[in-house]
Amino acid sequence: GGSPVVSISEELRYVDAYLYILSERYGERLSVEKDIDESLLDQAVPRLILQPIVENAVEHGVEKRTNGAIVLRIFAKKHLYLEVENDGVMTDQDRENISRLLSWDGTSEDNETRMGRIGIRNVNRRLKILYGEMYGLTIEEIAPESILARIMLPLTHAQGDLNV
């Protein structure tokens, strides 16, 4: 139902609703920080690309420790970036799963659905189909105990200073 594309502000409403549910569950254990370039709020993005990323971050960053922090950033630098950073440790198994999930080559589903990781795989696939191979989702450990999921999209129209 509805348009497959929404504004960032609408997408953030989904995320906020989801974060609200999480705050009910985790209370003080979860801290969320946002750093969002307000001038980008009317940029178009595919519906429901952020929530699975936030969900993944919480699952890895908060579930497994006494408390966790998530930072959500949205900014433009020639392209549009939506980032979710969480504190957490990536095991070798995580790295392997992630690289398998994100290296989708257009072929069969295999067994990802039962791994419950369909969210991040789907996001990456949708972005590549919609915008081309150079765009999509990456997830990497950027420092010990810090994991960054980054969605890169084309900017839908000139906005702010893009030559930053």
Tell what function each PLM region has:
Residues 1-140, 146-148:
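Two-component histidine phosphotransfer core
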Residues 142-164:
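C-terminal end segment of the histidine kinase catalytic
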